[in-house]
């Protein structure tokens, strides 16, 4: 239960930890509403989180671009994301965890979605350390490989 029960013209989501600017929801909404795009998301141009977290994010995005080339997006996990209900209905989403962002972007690539990005600031979480640990890199790689193999099989 979640995205699949949404029935509006647009579907959006954002993390609730205070690192992402709530006003960005309005900005991505205005951009998708006033354009012919399937998906609009933010791109974190200024980041105030820890250096190691920035490094993990850099390599994550680099690995994504290597395994899933051709997608017109810079920052895969940045939110808020908003997409049309019509586009959502075409996606074949399976993830119900942190990989959902990447899966949405993989599906956007597969479906040749028209994507827009808006720059944003990513604030430091002053209340807790990041949930992303070094060991998460191995989980990232595993999921990327699974989805890349799935894409190869789908294209046969």
Q: Predicted segment positions?
A:
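Catalytic donor-sugar/metal-binding loop of nucleotide-sugar-dependent glycosyltransferases
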Residues: 95-96, 105-123
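Short acidic donor-binding/metal-coordinating loop in glycosyltransferase active sites
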Residues: 8, 16-19
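Residue-level signature of catalytic and energy-coupling elements of molecular machines
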Residues: 2, 17, 84, 108, ...
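DNA-recognition element of transcription regulators
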Residues: 102
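Active-site loop/turn elements of alpha/beta-hydrolase fold enzymes
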Residues: 18, 44, 120
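Acceptor/aglycone-binding surface of glycosyltransferases and processive sugar-polymer synthases
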Residues: 1-5, 10, 23-98, 125-135, ...
């Amino acid at each position: 239960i979640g995205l699949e029960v949404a029935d509006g013209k647009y579907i959006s989501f954002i993390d609730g930890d205070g690192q992402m600017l709530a006003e960005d929801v309005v900005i991505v909404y205005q951009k998708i509403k006033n354009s012919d795009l399937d998906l609009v998301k933010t791109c974190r141009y200024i980041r105030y989180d820890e250096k190691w977290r920035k490094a993990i994010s850099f390599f994550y995005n680099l690995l994504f671009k290597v395994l899933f080339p051709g997608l017109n997006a810079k920052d895969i996990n940045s939110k808020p994301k908003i997409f049309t209900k019509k586009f959502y209905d075409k996606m074949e989403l399976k993830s119900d965890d942190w990989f959902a962002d990447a899966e949405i972007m993989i599906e956007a690539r597969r479906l040749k979605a028209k994507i827009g990005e808006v720059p944003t600031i990513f604030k430091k979480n002053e209340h807790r350390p990041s949930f992303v640990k070094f060991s998460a890199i191995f989980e990232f790689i595993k999921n990327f490989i699974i989805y890349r193999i799935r894409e190869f099989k789908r294209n046969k």
